[in-house]
Amino acid sequence: MKLAVYGKGGIGKSTTSCNISVALARRGKKVLQIGCDPKHDSTFTLTGFLIPTIIDTLQAKDYHYEDVWPEDVIYKGYGGVDCVEAGGPPAGAGCGGYVVGETVKLLKELNAFDEYDVILFDVLGDVVCGGFAAPLNYADYCLIVTDNGFDALFAANRIAASVREKARTHPLRLAGLIGNRTNKRDLIEKYVEAVPMPILEVLPLIEDIRVSRVKGKTLFEMAESDPSLNDVCDYYLNIADQILARPEGVVPKDVPDRDLFALLSDFYLNPQGSERSLAAV
């Protein structure tokens, strides 16, 4: 099974991805997490350091794939999760999609791409150009991380449009939304009313989630010394269980940006009195 995790920049995708990866490993699955961001910090909370990227390794070996070994690019993270960072082209040059393609090519050359029960792509920000939408070409499911904010949901709609486009050519489905660090969900529910899709989980505004990123640890690792965090880990285990059940998922509805902008902004500004629907926009 292959998963692609997207969401607005800074929404907590990498923290969420790392904890989902550990949760899947706790369920007995062999998991590989692939960071698809030039910052190459996707797997930081799994490994505790910034691991070398595949692009760095290939450049050091003059792109001689035959000289690269699995241990050169695959690092063991917390909970037995294997970690890879694709890296990226120099700032202002090149294409991130090319980097993702080279990463998958190398892992296939190493016979590693098919050795895992679950491969999770953690993809940079809310960029949904053809390049950074590339992981959707390999994914069975897309997961979108959001919060209860207007901007994050607007970004989610753009990502949903990419899923819809990719689903034309292969059996990709949107597994659903994950609300991250939010005590409210009214705007999320308004969005899902307009664009029907599952809400896999909504994690409350828990400071330890943010702190875990700074510490370079997953919530599961932190829970070893602070058992009160086991309740937080249960959120990620619930997400893992839903994914492993191979949900039907959805091909998202086509909602024009302007219509959704009007709907969400109206509800955001007037949450009590708004009865507006997309049909009225």
UniProtKB/Swiss-Prot annotation:
Keywords: 4Fe-4S, ATP-binding, Chlorophyll biosynthesis, Iron, Iron-sulfur, Magnesium, Metal-binding, Nucleotide-binding, Oxidoreductase, Photosynthesis. It comes from the Bacteria. It is an enzyme of class 1 (oxidoreductase). One of its GO terms (biological process) is light-independent chlorophyll biosynthetic process. It catalyses: chlorophyllide a + oxidized 2[4Fe-4S]-[ferredoxin] + 2 ADP + 2 phosphate = protochlorophyllide a + reduced 2[4Fe-4S]-[ferredoxin] + 2 ATP + 2 H2O. Binds 1 [4Fe-4S] cluster per dimer. HAMAP family: ChlL_BchL (MF_00355). This is Light-independent protochlorophyllide reductase iron-sulfur ATP-binding protein. It comes from Thermosynechococcus vestitus (strain NIES-2133 / IAM M-273 / BP-1). The gene is chlL.
